[in-house]
Amino acid sequence: MVSLTTCCLKNIVNQHAHVENTVLLYHLGLRWNCKTLYQCTQCNGINYTNSHSDQCKNKDLFLMKVIVKKNLAVARTLLSWGASPEYARLFCRNTEEEQALNVQHVADMSSSKILERLTMSYKENDEQLLITFYLLNLSTNFSTNLREQVRFNIVSYIICDLAIHQTFKTFYAKNYSLSTLYCIFLAIYYKLYTALRKMVKIYPGLKPFVYLTGFIFDDETVMETYNSTDDEISECKNRIIAIKGCYGNFHCRSDIDHMYAFSQNDYW
């Protein structure tokens, strides 16, 4: 059943989406980046045109973004339109924000549900990978124990090849988190270029990592887009070429016991 709040917001945005009413729309959480928000009746996503298109946005991903940007008015609207209160609570920075969004009594998202995203969600589409990226990199409410579980799962599923090892280790040493590198790696491996572009926009310093990972998989699109002539990158690229010459093409592995052995021997 559609809530009264949802019906009211829909009626307001349909009748008052005019320039002279922007103050009202902002106050009600119906404006974002100078554009009026609509809920798509076809895919249930969010758009700016009140018509379905490939530009419709995932509500949960949009919710994470607006909370990070501290726009609680829009966050309340998205929650009334069906966005996940579990995600909202994960991104609230304090109890005041939880109370403002009325999510202080929402149960914590289970660790298993979050960890499942590492192995399943990124195979679907760009938006699902971006949700995983936001959860692992921008949420402030992960426990230390959960972060260690995430770290172990990432190490467990990363490609077990010397070239990937070398590339990850180079940028991990630069204080980039393993989860950030992992999400970017997945975007390249599954050719989710929209997600890749948005992640690199947040971490522009990782363009060399993107280029090298694209080079490992012979992805011409990635190599052309993120081409780099940095000396350190050239050196790392030469090592990859040497490794390719010795071991040939690369393949994915998910041998947890094998990767656990690496993780216990200063692999990272």
Swiss-Prot record:
Keyword Transcription: no
Predominant subcellular localization, coarse grouping: host cell
Keywords of this entry: Early protein, Host membrane, Membrane, Transmembrane, Transmembrane helix
GO cellular component: host cell membrane; membrane
Keyword Iron: no
Induction: Expressed in the early phase of the viral replicative cycle.
Record topology, Extracellular segments: 194-268
Cytoplasmic topological domain residue ranges: 1-175
Compartment list: Host membrane
Domain of life from the UniProt record: Viruses
Transmembrane segments: 176-193
Family indicated by similarity: Belongs to the asfivirus MGF 300 family.
Biological function: Plays a role in virus cell tropism, and may be required for efficient virus replication in macrophages.
Protein name: Protein MGF 300-1L
Annotated organism of origin: African swine fever virus (isolate Warthog/Namibia/Wart80/1980)
